[in-house]
């Protein structure tokens, strides 16, 4: 059975940390493919503060060009209204039929997992893969993982990756302050930021 990773996010902008996480998940879990799923209108973020979805899609598409095992899906962008993870996973499960999905997300999501809508469906349609993030204690995360494993009769995969302290927020702030960011970004992404004059002072 084909194994497909699903890596969602606003990607505003996508950076080398995202590429590293997706690549490590691909290698460690022996996935056939990792699908990047740029968020449309995420329910947990202020929509007015997010770059236009078409531009974010363009940045992700450019960033993953060098990797044959990465792809991009526009389901959440094309779907009008709120985007919930369980709906995305259900869509992918029905679209691909005979596949095993691995939903890749950060440690912050594991801590707040009980607040996610229809969490049982997320576990029904996918294997949850959680990677560590700066500021989160590994032992606390593993304890939380065990609690959810028992509560939902599942087996969350924990990826102990390098803590790369790069964030989209940091990049936006640096661009806003006219500081260099190209070493944080995959090739071509900085050109798109320049093309649309993103994140700069108004």
Curated annotation (Swiss-Prot):
The keyword Nucleotidyltransferase applies. The gene is nadD. The keyword ATP-binding applies. It comes from the Bacteria. InterPro entries: Cyt_trans-like (IPR004821), NadD/NMNAT (IPR005248), Rossmann-like_a/b/a_fold (IPR014729). It comes from Clostridium perfringens (strain ATCC 13124 / DSM 756 / JCM 1290 / NCIMB 6125 / NCTC 8237 / Type A). Keywords: ATP-binding, NAD, Nucleotide-binding, Nucleotidyltransferase, Pyridine nucleotide biosynthesis, Transferase. GO terms for biological process: NAD biosynthetic process. Pathway: Cofactor biosynthesis; NAD(+) biosynthesis; deamido-NAD(+) from nicotinate D-ribonucleotide: step 1/1. Its EC number is 2.7.7.18. It catalyses: nicotinate beta-D-ribonucleotide + ATP + H(+) = deamido-NAD(+) + diphosphate. NCBIfam families: cyt_tran_rel, nicotinate (nicotinamide) nucleotide adenylyltransferase, PRK00071.1-3. Catalyzes the reversible adenylation of nicotinate mononucleotide (NaMN) to nicotinic acid adenine dinucleotide (NaAD). Belongs to the NadD family. GO terms for molecular function: ATP binding; nicotinate-nucleotide adenylyltransferase activity. This is Probable nicotinate-nucleotide adenylyltransferase.
